[in-house]
Swiss-Prot record:
Residues the record lists as binding ATP: 60-63, 68-69, 78, 190-194, 214
Binding partners and assembly: Homotrimer.
N6-succinyllysine sites (modified residues): 211, 230
Segments for region (Disordered): 34-59
GN (gene name): MMAB
Family, similarity comment: Belongs to the Cob(I)alamin adenosyltransferase family.
Protein name in the entry: Corrinoid adenosyltransferase MMAB
Signal peptide stretch: none
Lineage: Eukaryota, Metazoa, Chordata, Craniata, Vertebrata
Organelle transit peptide residues: 1-32
Naturally occurring in which organism (per UniProt): Homo sapiens
Swiss-Prot/TrEMBL GO biological process terms: cobalamin metabolic process
Keywords for the protein's UniProt record, in alphabetical order: Acetylation, ATP-binding, Disease variant, Mitochondrion, Nucleotide-binding, Phosphoprotein, Transferase, Transit peptide
Length: 250
């Protein structure tokens, strides 16, 4: 979300996921703050001592009725297409985070790329959480998704592809723990792209968001193959299951 972009400058980006950024938005921007239970005004609440720092709660209860806020302040059902896209992007970042732990344990140099991608996914969430139909120029100033990350992914893809043997058959998710984890990330990325495409077609988000996810799935596929090669693990090849061939051998 946009506040994640702001949060990265405040040191929040590395500690908050996409959901956490929604919470940070409520703290950083007054329009997101709830008035609390019906009939209770802020002035009626017990005030903390001036000597005790106020620790914000992670839960706000504002979403208990099945609605949540976009960055623009618009309230939408939690199963809205916008939140489906944001949530799947968050899931993708979590999957990459798991793969990154495995990558770091092995000391692979592409760990930095994966971490950078996680940060970029925060920006993707920013753009998605700012629907164009309700966004003002002030919102878009923080959340417009540029083409730079797409070009960077293409450079990384070309770098690894040049070191890999050409594909001569369909491969299955395999090649060791890291390779398999990256294939899982690729599958989640494809789902995130499918959630984003309708928003692009409706004019709710920039086409660069869908382009980035499309390129990211290619990167994750290439990186999975590269990881298998670097670790000396064999990739499993797809072989058609032909029952007739088995019966002929009887």
């Amino acid at each position: 979300m946009a506040v994640c972009g702001l949060g990265s400058r405040l040191g929040l980006g590395s500690r908050l996921g996409l959901r956490g950024c929604f919470g940070a938005a409520r703290l950083l921007y007054p329009r997101f703050q709830s008035r609390g239970p019906q009939g209770v005004e802020d002035g009626d609440r017990p005030q903390p001592s001036s000597k005790t720092p106020r620790i914000p709660k992670i839960y706000t209860k504002t979403g208990d009725k099945g609605f949540s806020s976009t960055f623009t302040g618009e309230r939408r059902p939690k199963d809205d297409q916008v939140f489906e896209a944001v949530g799947t992007t968050d899931e993708l970042s979590s999957a990459i985070g798991f793969a990154l732990e495995l990558v770091t344990e092995k000391g692979h140099t592409f760990a930095e790329e994966l971490q950078k991608i996680q940060c970029t996914l925060q920006d993707v969430g920013s753009a998605l959480a700012t629907p164009c139909s309700s966004a003002r120029e002030a919102h878009l100033k923080y959340t417009t998704f540029k083409a730079g990350p797409i070009l960077e992914l293409e450079q990384w893809i070309d770098k690894y592809t040049s070191q890999l043997p050409p594909l001569t058959a369909f491969i299955l998710p395999s090649g060791g723990k890291i390779s398999s984890a990256l294939h899982f990330c690729r599958a989640v990325c494809r789902r995130a792209e499918r959630r984003v495409v309708p928003l692009v077609q409706m004019g709710e988000t920039d086409a660069n968001v869908a382009k980035f996810l499309n390129r990211l799935s290619d990167y994750l596929f290439t990186l999975a193959r590269y990881a298998a090669m670097k670790e000396g693990n064999q990739e499993k090849i797809y072989m058609k299951n032909d029952p007739s061939a088995e019966s002929e051998g009887l």
